[in-house]
Amino acid sequence: NREGMSYKIMRVAVFFDLPTNTKAERKAAAQFRKFLLDDGFDMLQYSVYTRLCPNRDVAEKHMMRVKRHAPNSGSVRLLYLTEHQFTHMHVIVGEKTVQEKNVPAGQLAFF
């Protein structure tokens, strides 16, 4: 029981650009993507993954996991967004992902 823990829904967004020139680099990139999926992230775009979290504490826990599993080369960035900010994203070309369409704003999805 954590008293005082707030429940402001957050999104953790991970953006990455990883080298894939060698077999080892391709393997590292694939392992990182698999880690993100296994850790509950959904692919928003090919190198952009997001995860819904009930609050900032949980978001920070997942940020630390991303840091531990990130490859040693390339570029990996992480951004915290409130659910309000995320739902106001404009899709200029293309359309929302199936996950975005199926989970209404502010509703956590548990699988």
Regions found by a protein language model. Give the residues of each.
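Basic nucleic-acid-binding interfaces
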Residues: R2-A13, L18-F111
